[in-house]
Amino acid sequence: MKDLIIVSSYCDTKQKEDILRNLVNQCYKENSFDLMVVSHTTIPDDISKKTTLSLYDSKNELLYDWDLRSKPWFNPGNEREIQSIFTGFFNSHLAIWRMIILGNSVAKNLGYKKVHHIEYDCDIKDFTEIYDNSKLLDTYDCINYTKII
């Protein structure tokens, strides 16, 4: 069985849909992986037809409580890191985790042994890293990327 690439997305604009479409086309041309798109917005037919699985979940719960807001960081001009709850009005972590759980549950139920989870706004020019990660998953349970400061 092929590895599965799960793409989580929330494409509420044409521009975001086009970014997702570009990623799906890159994966479709590679043809070495099965592809699932999980989204809280409807998935256009032309995108869905190029996937192995498409999962639309209308429940897109956002957290608005002050104590549940995320603290995104940004570093303008690489001069000073700023971390604040006041950069947005809500936290989307619950919605994101819901897509991860739904995608992984479907993958497990269908018998996939290896899953690669990426966001819709990735641009994959070279799949070497995914092939390398697939080999690593023969030995390890998980491969995680972290930001080193």
List each model region and its residues.
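Conserved donor-nucleotide/metal-binding helix-loop-beta segment in metal-dependent transferases, i.e.
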Residues: 124-149
